[in-house]
Amino acid sequence: MKNMLHPQKYETHVLDDLMEFYEGVIGYPEIDLRLAGEEAWLKGVNPELAEAVKKIIKTIRRYLEGSPYDGSEKPIPRYIIAEIFSQIAPEVQLLVNALDTEGKYGFLKHIKKLNLNSLAMLSKNYNENDKLWKELENEGYVYLE
C-alpha cells in the first residue's frame, strides 16, 4: 500500500502550491488549505517531509492569519512573501532534495535572497553606492519589488 501512494506526487504538489503562492496566483488561506492536504498525505509516506510541510504552514499562518491579507482579494506585498520564503527555506530545501526539480521552480532561486529594499529602509546609513550594498548585489542578493 505504501508504494501505491506515490510520495513524489505530494512533494511536487507542495512545490507547485508554493510556486503559485510566491507568484501571487493564490493567497491566504488557500495556501494553508492546500498545504494541509498535502501534509496529510505525506504523513503516510514520508513523515520527515510531512513535518517540514507542517512547519511551512505554521510560518505562513504566523505572518498572515488575522492580517489584512487573510481571506481578502488584496495581493500580499512582495516584502511579506520574501520574508516568509526566507523563513521556510530549510523546509523547502528538504522538499527540493527529495525531488529532481530540473529548474521547474523558478521561485526557489529567490528563497535565500535578502530583501535589500527592507534592509535599506531599516538602515540609517543606507547609501546605494556604499561598498557593502554593492558587494551584496554582486553576491546575487536582489531588491524585491
Curated annotation (Swiss-Prot):
For this record, the Gene Ontology CC terms, alphabetical, are:
virion component
A Pfam family found in this protein is RIP_P131-like
The protein here is known as: RNAP inhibitory protein
Q: What is its main location?
A: virion
The record's subcellular location field reads: Virion
Q: What does this protein do?
A: Plays a role in the inhibition of global transcription by interacting with the RNA polymerase (RNAP) clamp, locking it in a fixed position and inhibiting the formation and/or stability of the pre-initiation complex (PIC). Also overlaps with the transcription factor B binding site; overall RIP probably interferes with DNA loading onto RNAP but does not displace DNA once it is loaded. May play a role in virus particle assembly, possibly by dissociating active RNAP from the virus genome.
Q: Which organism is it from?
A: Acidianus two-tailed virus (ATV)
Q: Which UniProt keywords apply?
A: Eukaryotic host gene expression shutoff by virus, Eukaryotic host transcription shutoff by virus, Host gene expression shutoff by virus, Host-virus interaction, Inhibition of eukaryotic host transcription initiation by virus, Virion
Transmembrane helix as UniProt keyword: no
Note the subunit structure. Answer: Interacts with host RNA polymerase (RNAP) subunits Rpo1N and Rpo2.
Q: Does the keyword Lipid metabolism apply?
A: no
Q: Which family does it belong to?
A: Belongs to the viral ORF131/RIP family.
Quote the record's domain comment. The C-terminal tail binds inside the RNAP DNA-binding channel, locking the clamp into a fixed conformation (in S.acidocaldarius).
Q: Which InterPro entries match?
A: RIP_P131-like (IPR054511)
> What GO biological process term is on the record, naming one?
symbiont-mediated suppression of host gene expression
